[in-house]
Amino acid sequence: SIKKKPESNDTAICVLDAGMNDSQREQLKNKVDEVAKAEWDIEVSNLKVMGKEWLKSQVSRAFLPKYFPKYEKYLWIDCDAWVNDWKCVDLYFKACEKGKLGITQTMGPGYKIMSKVKWLFGKLAIVKSQNFKHALSSNIDISKSRKLAFAPHINIGVFSLQKNSPCWEVWQKNLRQTLKNGKIFGSEGLAINLSVYVDEVDTEFLPLNCNWIASNLLPKYDSIQKTFVEPYLPNNKIGIMHLAAGIWKNNIDMRLDKNVKIDIYNLQDKKETKSLRSEE
């Protein structure tokens, strides 16, 4: 999806190898600028790893300048996300200027539930928001955990940072803490939420279409422009489509099977059967 955009000519594509096989590496060889083998940049117990080498990517993304040192700006895009509109990429690179973190909060028009709460009786309830739950299980100080309880969750699947941003160090500090007692998966996300909401790193929040998580809210399709758009007016074009958590049909994940398609509405409110993957 990046190479198809003419604006990408002066943009390097780099990949972290967190357990690819020889065939996968060979396929990528002539399509990207660099491939670097991910390491455990923070020591993690073998009991937590359990042979899942791909979990390195949860840690190594917080150390991107170490792996790819010759660049000044970094835009991380998860492998289950793709670029639909290059204007979004430009926004991310603009957002991270002056050391800021460019990132998107998981909130916007159409989101009906921001945090899970289990009501016991009367006014008494148990907070079960993703941030709060993960913070407690990672043994994060209760005062810090409470700051995260109802803060809009920040998805770490797409973000931008300059090479010399102070955010790297803050993020790495929090990642060491979350890895100490919590699970590896999701640790980097919790760490960035701590960095933003507790340490208050300088952040440029970008619109939801810059990291559109389709499993949270399906897009619409503009049949005339042949592109995915937000489902509510003014129907902005989706910048980066993110298939986090998968798009499932008949127990098959669209990320793993190119043939999976689902029904979504177009701008005339008629159903169309589409794949949410990037066209090849």
Model-derived features: where do they sit?
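Glycosyltransferase catalytic domains, chiefly GT-A lineage
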Residues: S1-E279
